[in-house]
Design a protein with these regions (language model features):
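A glycine- and small/hydrophobic-rich beta-loop-beta segment
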Residues: 223, 232-270, 274
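Nucleotide/pyrophosphate-binding catalytic subdomain
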Residues: 1-216, 271
Length: 283
């Protein structure tokens, strides 16, 4: 029996149909004998909608109130996800970031995790239930709700996996893993079965979008195995490990295209470089 943390992004829980599919997937995972903890993001474009509403009310809203507003999207998701799980016959409990034991600094809008004490999540799992945790949020040391920033749900999942001693952290997205290059640019790009943390961080730094760099850094620091998978095909994705088990280590693992840069080459043969003038000797 394994303990698996599964994170689902906004597109994966965008509507009721998607939530029912996720609930069915969790049910299949549990049927194999595994315990499951879910981390979910806000539904679809919910965060963008909340940001627009805030801007309509106040062009310079206070950071504390923005965090209170934005994190409401994830709280909506965890409640609905638990309802979908219960409808599928899977007992579940929802937890906000603070209820799950996430303590952060007070940097509203981009808070950093200071510690995680997930004893309530562990108690739920030990009772045979699925714990559903709101991503990208916590509680500051002065007891204010905080938002971890964009991509914070991935970081939540990795930190929670470490805190629980989980066997793996599965990040479900709208792509089926990490590819040798951008499949939108090169349709023949191959999905990699495994890649090392260092290799993925290198690709992320120059444009590879998922999973976000911050979560990979946390996973590498604490040795949390990541499994990047598709929430739409459910097929095996890409394992991200300390060392990828290649039979023969590839010299080039992947290529990240960057259309935002241009290269200008100047030929020295076309450039006249004057000889430096020497000062006249003073007698």
């Amino acid at each position: 029996m394994a303990l698996v943390v599964q994170k689902f992004g906004g597109t994966s829980v965008a509507d009721a149909d998607r939530m029912r599919e996720v609930a069915d997937h969790v049910k299949r995972t549990r049927s194999r004998g595994d315990d499951v903890v879910l981390v979910v993001s806000a539904m679809g474009k919910e965060t963008d909608l909340l940001l627009r509403l805030a801007d309509e009310v106040n062009e310079e809203p206070p950071g504390r109130e923005m965090d209170m507003l934005i994190t409401a999207g994830e709280r909506k998701s965890i409640a609905l996800m638990c309802m979908a799980l219960e409808a599928a016959g899977v007992p579940a409990d929802s937890f906000t970031g603070s209820q799950a034991g996430f303590q952060t600094d007070g940097n509203h809008g981009n808070a950093k995790i200071l510690s995680v004490d997930p004893h309530r999540v562990r108690d739920s799992v030990d009772k045979g239930r699925v714990a559903v945790v709101a991503g990208a949020q916590g509680m500051s040391t002065d007891n204010n709700v905080t938002f971890l920033g964009r991509g914070g749900s991935d970081t939540t999942a990795v930190a929670l996996a470490h805190g629980l001693g989980a066997d793996a952290c599965e990040l479900y997205t709208d792509v089926s893993g990490v590819f040798t290059t951008d499949p939108r640019v090169c349709p023949t790009a191959k999905r990699m079965e495994s890649i090392s943390f260092d290799e993925l961080l290198e690709m992320t730094a120059v444009g590879c979008p998922k999973p976000v760099m911050r979560s990979v850094e946390v996973a590498r620091a604490f040795g949390v195995p990541l499994h990047v998978r598709s929430a739409f095909t459910w097929e095996p994705g890409t394992w991200v490990l300390e060392e990828a088990p290649d039979m023969e280590r590839a010299i080039i693992k992947g290529i990240v295209p960057d259309t935002s840069q241009a290269k200008v080459t100047l030929s020295l043969s076309l450039i006249h470089i004057s000889e430096p003038t020497r000062p006249e000797r003073i007698e």
